[in-house]
């Protein structure tokens, strides 16, 4: 970590804790800043604030008092989840207090080069794939960012010989100014988080900030399947490396079932460790990064063939009596489940789906359900899911929980079948989040395996 004097004796307000705010507070304190942390969660319910107070950091909890900004702060570090129309943020902007993001703070002190990955879908899987391939190739890749490891914490241990492989959300990117990765990946761009950004155009603008400071000596990897990529590519100074599953490009591409970089065949799509058309795209982006990083083709192929997915993201859980289980609890919308289904033989597939509907068009799912062996339906959206199943002429059963659904699916399954949890709905009608929903699937698998 670089020891910089930019924040020495500067009064800095950390707005919002969570993992990133806590990490930023500790880093800035180490750099000699005079830190105040403000979090909306009450102090007695806030272990992170309690821990920071024990370290001598000033904490103010329970609300966001606008008058706090009258204390002449020289910087604000804003939690990514707090929007820019928040009264505290608006007041800071009115007072011309510079607002930093936690990832930019990490960038300022990082000795290690950064590979940044953003996009609407596939960020976590691609980030993990890239780190796995780089590490297998003898490099030292450190996961950081939106993947659960705050960048400002990871950077404190990183050295010049490391590489920070950083997952970046639109929330994290919208406020960056100086941030400059050496390699950036945009997996795809879909209309999501519009409640935060206001419009698709503003959402894309936030994602596009990943390349704002890049030069021709840096590399920007874009999804050439999307027309918007061609438009955006004309506006960057970075060297663009495209990837595509639909056409041959001057980068990474799929042709006749083989994944290539330039003219070099790397791996057959059927040899990838995770199924689905979206995972071919993720693998192509990974191949582009790996080749730019000097990783040998055989290492890339070996890693991609053994990659088992990320937890809750089309995760291959295992087999019981030659019946394979996949946990795709992260699929909370129709598009995600459609992509998951693309990797399987429907005639041997039992799909567990349903949950809280957030405006899905279930008719869009009907073509992807055709030929399914069976559906197990659950949750608030059950009646709409049943109508989709009927239109696809797929038989179904109803369950009251993921555990019950998994047990039913296993009773119906035969040797060679696959059981897939890919809900196409949010979890909040039955579970606090998709992780808890997926964990119940994993726990039920463990019980079934123990009884087998």
Swiss-Prot record:
Keyword flag RNA-binding: no
Organism domain of life: Bacteria
Positions of ATP binding: 119-125
InterPro entries: Mur-like_cat_sf (IPR036565), Mur_ligase_C (IPR004101), Mur_ligase_C_dom_sf (IPR036615), Mur_ligase_cen (IPR013221), MurD (IPR005762)
Pathway(s) served: Cell wall biogenesis; peptidoglycan biosynthesis
Record-linked Pfam families: Mur_ligase_C, Mur_ligase_M, MurD-like_N
A single cellular component GO annotation: cytoplasm
GO biological process, one term: peptidoglycan biosynthetic process
EC number: 6.3.2.9
Location relative to the cell: Cytoplasm
Catalysed reaction equations from the record: UDP-N-acetyl-alpha-D-muramoyl-L-alanine + D-glutamate + ATP = UDP-N-acetyl-alpha-D-muramoyl-L-alanyl-D-glutamate + ADP + phosphate + H(+)
Primary localization class, coarse: cytoplasm
Example of a GO MF term: ATP binding
Keyword annotations of the record: ATP-binding, Cell cycle, Cell division, Cell shape, Cell wall biogenesis/degradation, Cytoplasm, Ligase, Nucleotide-binding, Peptidoglycan synthesis
Top EC class for this record: ligase
Biological function: Cell wall formation. Catalyzes the addition of glutamate to the nucleotide precursor UDP-N-acetylmuramoyl-L-alanine (UMA).
Similarity comment text for this entry: Belongs to the MurCDEF family.
Protein name: UDP-N-acetylmuramoylalanine--D-glutamate ligase
Lineage: Bacteria, Bacillati, Bacillota, Bacilli, Lactobacillales
Gene: murD
